[in-house]
Amino acid sequence: MNLKPLADRVIVKPAPAEEKTKGGLIIPDTGKEKPQYGEVVAVGTGKVADSGQLLEMQIKVGQKVLYGKYSGTEVSVEGEDYLIMRESDIFAILD
């Protein structure tokens, strides 16, 4: 099944959570923080401005992005976890 976002929405595959601390201690599942970055796997067609003009997406598939802690909606498709969020929820592109 393929996910195809609509309008100005983006589908992000979150990076895996850290398993160990820098000192080598294993972090239990309850202590893991959700990562705030991931890779874009799909983008919508863009946002329609008030004038009716279609504004292209600045985010492209394959880019690594930084987003807010509470951004997006979590979905699971065929055992894989994704976030669906608006392009405006993305803070930066990571190089």
Swiss-Prot record:
Cellular component per GO, a single term: cytoplasm
Gene Ontology molecular function: ATP binding; metal ion binding; protein folding chaperone; protein-folding chaperone binding; unfolded protein binding
Alphabetical GO biological process terms: chaperone cofactor-dependent protein refolding
Pfam families xrefs: Cpn10
Subcellular location: Cytoplasm
Keywords attached to this entry: Chaperone, Cytoplasm
InterPro entries assigned: Chaperonin_GroES, Chaperonin_GroES_sf, Chaprnonin_Cpn10_CS, GroES-like_sf
SMART domains assigned to the protein according to its UniProt record, in alphabetical order: Cpn10
Main localization category: cytoplasm
Origin superkingdom: Bacteria
Alphabetical list of PROSITE patterns matching this protein: CHAPERONINS_CPN10 (PS00681)
Quaternary structure, from the entry: Heptamer of 7 subunits arranged in a ring. Interacts with the chaperonin GroEL.
Membership in a protein family: Belongs to the GroES chaperonin family.
Main function: Together with the chaperonin GroEL, plays an essential role in assisting protein folding. The GroEL-GroES system forms a nano-cage that allows encapsulation of the non-native substrate proteins and provides a physical environment optimized to promote and accelerate protein folding. GroES binds to the apical surface of the GroEL ring, thereby capping the opening of the GroEL channel.
Record's protein name: Co-chaperonin GroES
Organism: Chlorobium phaeobacteroides (strain DSM 266 / SMG 266 / 2430)
Gene encoding the protein: groES
